[in-house]
UniProtKB/Swiss-Prot annotation:
Domain notes: The N-terminus is involved in binding to the fiber protein p37. The C-terminus contains glycine-rich motifs (GRM) and mediates the host specificity. The glycine-rich motifs assemble into a 3-layered PG(II) sandwich domain.
Additional record remark: This phage use outer membrane protein ompA as a receptor.
Function: Receptor binding protein (RBP) that is at the tip of the long tail fibers and serves as the phage recognition site for the attachment host receptor OmpC.
Keywords: Host-virus interaction, Viral attachment to host cell, Viral tail fiber protein, Viral tail protein, Virion, Virus entry into host cell
Pfam families reported for this sequence: GP38 (PF05268), Gp38_N (PF21721)
Annotated compartments: Virion
Motif (GRM 8): 210-216
Organism annotation: Escherichia phage AR1 (Bacteriophage AR1)
Marked site positions, Interaction with the fiber protein p37: W7, W20, W35
Disordered: annotated segments: 213-243
Descriptive protein name: Receptor-recognizing protein gp38
Length: 259
């Protein structure tokens, strides 16, 4: 809730918890000297802290922003976060986000877009890695990255001994880091699933021919080695930060494209 008039002093006390106006002004991020009338419409920061979650739905961030209204909001990230889907950015701020600003503090941990899937039998199933942060509010998003921001790795390229890509001929591509799925769909040699810490391996015939492994964070998947047979290309990684440029207070470690 913002400070309102006409009784600015009492409203400032209720909103900030400070009985002295100097303290209230500090909570409202106002320098001294100041006019009390300038407190009207200002709000204290709304602060949230999140620990590790490897299946996180970024809608949670958006919901908290709208709950706070126009008040500035702070997200402190203290554990690794991974989006639940490569189709949904981990952290998305669309243009209708109402807050004065959104402060994102990453405390020595990593925020991840989810990894893409490897190619499967019937030449289906591959997908790009997921975007980590989608920013459509420009500099109102302030990022203090004391850890890492990573786009999901791309899926690995597939390999088939026959052009019809029937399962009995196919090596599936590996999943991109983190948690991308290896290509299967009945593949004789399915690709491996990625974990938080490593991409999945491509399926291997046991000879010198094999499918491509999944990509590391912010990297495309790997190419298959088909010899004279058939292959599909690996997929692309997700961006670390897409959309419009935020206010970078500390860039930190970045894996994948950023604005």
């Amino acid at each position: 809730m913002a400070v309102t008039g006409p009784w600015v002093g009492s409203s400032a006390v209720v909103n900030t918890g400070q009985n002295w106006m100097v303290g209230a002004a500090q909570r409202l991020r106002m320098g001294a000297p100041f006019w009390m009338s300038n407190m009207i419409g200002r709000s204290v920061e709304v602060i949230h802290t999140l620990g590790a979650d490897h299946n996180f739905n970024g809608q949670w961030f958006r919901d908290r922003c709208f709950e706070a209204g126009s008040a500035p909001i702070v997200f402190n990230i203290t554990g690794d976060l991974v989006s639940y889907s490569r189709d949904v950015p981990l952290f998305f701020m669309y243009g209708d986000t109402p807050n004065e600003y959104v402060q994102l503090n990453i405390h020595g941990v990593t925020m991840y877009g989810r990894g893409g899937n490897g190619w499967a039998a019937c030449a289906i199933g591959a997908s790009d890695g997921g975007v980590c942060i989608q920013n459509d509010i420009g500099g109102r998003l302030r990022i203090n990255n004391g850890g890492a921001i990573a786009g999901g790795g791309g899926g690995g390229g597939g390999y088939s001994q026959a052009n019809n890509w029937a399962g009995k001929y196919v090596c599936g591509g590996g999943g991109g880091r983190p948690f991308g799925l290896g290509g299967n769909n009945g593949a004789r040699w399915p690709g491996g699933n990625a974990s938080l810490t490593s991409p999945g391996a491509g399926g291997n015939t046991g000879t010198r021919y094999y499918a491509g492994g999944g990509g590391e964070v912010g990297q495309p998947g790997q190419y298959a080695n088909p010899g004279a047979s058939y292959s599909t290309p690996p997929t692309s990684p997700g961006a670390a930060v897409a959309g419009s440029a935020p206010t970078w207070q500390n860039v930190g470690a970045i894996y994948g494209p950023r604005v």
